[in-house]
């Protein structure tokens, strides 16, 4: 499975998260996953909440349309974006 794949109702992203980064950004490929750096620390779900907010802003969707399907407690996550209004260039280059 690739880092970015399309499904009937949106996109599925396989992510590697780097918490406590200096700024929020989509870094690029990290093995077979998409690396995303976020400023939030990995404490009490802060990183997941921040990741959801950041991805919602990048894809121009509501936070409720960003679903963490797998990896709630780890750095390796699978996230589904429902009906994205915008696809960042880093992600568009990786779509199948």
UniProtKB/Swiss-Prot annotation:
Gene3D superfamilies to which the protein is assigned, alphabetical: YggU-like (3.30.1200.10)
GO CC annotations, alphabetized: cytoplasm
Signal peptide from the UniProt entry: none
Any Pfam family the entry gives: DUF167
Top-rank taxon: Bacteria
Family in the record: Belongs to the UPF0235 family.
HAMAP family: UPF0235
Protein name (Swiss-Prot/TrEMBL): UPF0235 protein Ent638_3359
Species assigned in the record: Enterobacter sp. (strain 638)
Lineage per the UniProt record: Bacteria, Pseudomonadati, Pseudomonadota, Gammaproteobacteria, Enterobacterales
